[in-house]
Amino acid sequence: MSELSFDAPVWHHGKALRKGYTTGSCATAAAKVAALMVLRQHLIHQVSIVTPSGVTLCLNVESPHIEGQQAIAAIRKDGGDDVDATHGMLIFARVTLNDSGEITLTGGEGIGTVTRKGIGLPLGSAAINRTPRHTIESAVREAIGPARGADVEIFAPEGEARAQKTYNSRLGILGGISIIGTTGIVTPMSEESWKRSLSLELEIKRASGLTRVILVPGNHGERFVREQMGVDTQAVVTMSNFVGYMIEEAVRLGFCQIVLVGHPGKLIKIAAGIFHTHSHIADARMETLVAHLALLGAPLELLTLVSDCDTTEAAMEHIEAYGFGHIYNHLARRICLRVMQMLRFTKTPPVCDAILFSFDNHILGSNRPVDEIAKELQC
């Protein structure tokens, strides 16, 4: 990615969106400028780095301070128009020179600690991912030369509070944020980074020994599992709209059972073979309901009423009034059939189950008895 392509906006739904840079780039720049300030013994207010994607960033330095053989500097995180929990916070680096010839990297205040296997970092280490570790160490080595050593501490005073708005605790990263970024650049509306964060949670679950997973669209699904199924939510992973991707990731990781749990408004799309459930990709909820109601012998009057509905909830009221609630078991079986069709070339496909529930947390339907599914999940 050239500097020109970094400055060029990302167009999304007709809007020009600005790119940003990662916490990894912030930490790298802060460490580099702190090392330079120790060597030169004067404050520096701007620093440039080359990101892993080849982009040169020129960043403003905040809170520079020198005290003997130690310096501190901060870079303010700018996610561009892809605002996340870390946007606008300061990422600090403290660099202390020594004669060891080695560079040691640690995480201080506000940087999370790894407490579970599965994310590629040792247990008990700071949540500074591999690529940022490499770029930080390389930038400091470039600044101090081959003979000197340095202790580098990355810290973020707001980190612990900001981390509460992230997935970190679910990934076993406690006490702060993660220093992340494989390219160093934040691309607005990047589905790939979002999908990767969801997949990472699957990897954590598998590394902990789980072989069965419950995929839900969001928090409502997790609450249903806890309150109505009596199953430990440790097995629950959010799939958002990325149904097909998360199923494929679960297969890749070797899960033997996948249970899809959600409201018909989301899961009904899978019955039509739609594995990305965001409305900008496809809708077809009413069409799917009408088709399957017709297969079950529903009268034309009901089909017309459902076809004219704007929401699944409205359609469900008509379905209940006409006594066709058994469609939800039918749809759950159809969902499982569609999943197995998607996985037809998989050598050892997992068991697939589907459970549909209402907004008031009542079971609407499933491909087989929910008690049976719950019992297997508790094994």
Curated annotation (Swiss-Prot):
GO molecular function, one term: cobalt-precorrin-5B C1-methyltransferase activity
Pfam family, one: CbiD
Protein name: Cobalt-precorrin-5B C(1)-methyltransferase
Family: Belongs to the CbiD family.
Annotated HAMAP family: CbiD (MF_00787)
A biological process term (GO) from this entry: methylation
Gene for this chain: cbiD
InterPro entries according to UniProt: CbiD, CbiD_sf
Keywords, in A-Z order: Cobalamin biosynthesis, Methyltransferase, S-adenosyl-L-methionine, Transferase
Recorded metabolic or biological pathway in which this protein acts: Cofactor biosynthesis; adenosylcobalamin biosynthesis; cob(II)yrinate a,c-diamide from sirohydrochlorin (anaerobic route): step 6/10
Catalytic activity: Co-precorrin-5B + S-adenosyl-L-methionine = Co-precorrin-6A + S-adenosyl-L-homocysteine
Lineage: superkingdom: Bacteria
Documented EC number(s): 2.1.1.195
Annotated organism of origin: Salmonella typhimurium (strain LT2 / SGSC1412 / ATCC 700720)
